């Protein structure tokens, strides 16, 4: 595998990541995957994202389009999945989130939470039943871990699965579940007499209800739901046989967080590229906004942080592909890249002036979305504590 791209001819202007020549760090297949997903985002998603964000909708038919694109479970092997490396998956996440965090969230939950939980912990029958349909988008999955009172502390979950003969009966509520109202199957985590276990719950099971959460200011082009389990009866075959304890759902979250390490950079990159184009065309005091020192200082500082985040993301991806990335390393990536992407989106909004509060320009939409990304799949505070534990050997979570 060659990692060297041909030397680029000198240009008069560069896109932010071109200054870092990050394409040189990628092989031809990785560059092709990124270009393919970017084309889909530019032609299919970006022309519609303002309408979807404003109306708080995400068309269900996008699932099959994502499936045809090959991004659903693309980093998994077999069962109709592409089996790409981690860097390719990350690059796809980056391009999707350049469109909107809602698109990357859909793909991330489908592939790294729903499909990954089945792929890693499911029986052969469960894998064969669900993974091919989830890979094509003919079926949609969701992942039920968070509860109304238990987000950063999932060990305290109150969802309970009790034995009744050979069946399981599940009760309680899950909250903030992406794709919940769209899903055909939910991976639900519950307390049992033997500890936390995972279950595959078809969403047409009696007693299962998904209630969409409305009036959101963030992730509006995404479906977020409450899942209610009221005496949901499942056969023994619904249990994920290889999921034992809290480490099982946490390993799924670590997989999804890796996609965020790249994905957040897409939101930051799109914000910055949008703002540079605006600054070059906007006349202020008889010259382009881009010609002022303060403007160039802001653009340069944002470019430095974006490029550093990209280098970190690719480095973590190479580690993941080589020997596996540790959870605290993923915490480093999510903490840094989401934090910096949010700062970039906010700063870009200021450079856009009054125009920046409209949906015509993407930075404020990205900033609103990144407020959610900052919180879900581990708050920044929890990632700081994860890093702190790695540095000191002491857990300060309580």
Give the ranges of each region predicted by the language model.
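A short, charged helix-loop
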Residues: 225-251
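A short, Trp-centered hydrophobic/proline-enriched beta-strand micro-motif
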Residues: 137-145
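N-terminal glycine-rich flavin-associated loop
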Residues: 105-125, 151
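Alpha-helical interface subdomain recognition
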Residues: 1-99, 109, 121-126, 133, ...
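Hydrophobic, small-residue-rich alpha-helical packing segments that form membrane-like cores
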Residues: 152-153, 168
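Short Gly/Pro-enriched turn/cap motifs at secondary-structure boundaries
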Residues: 149-152, 176-179, 191, 216-223
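Flexible, small-/acidic-enriched active-site or ligand-binding loops
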Residues: 156, 204-233
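A short core secondary-structure module
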Residues: 171-211
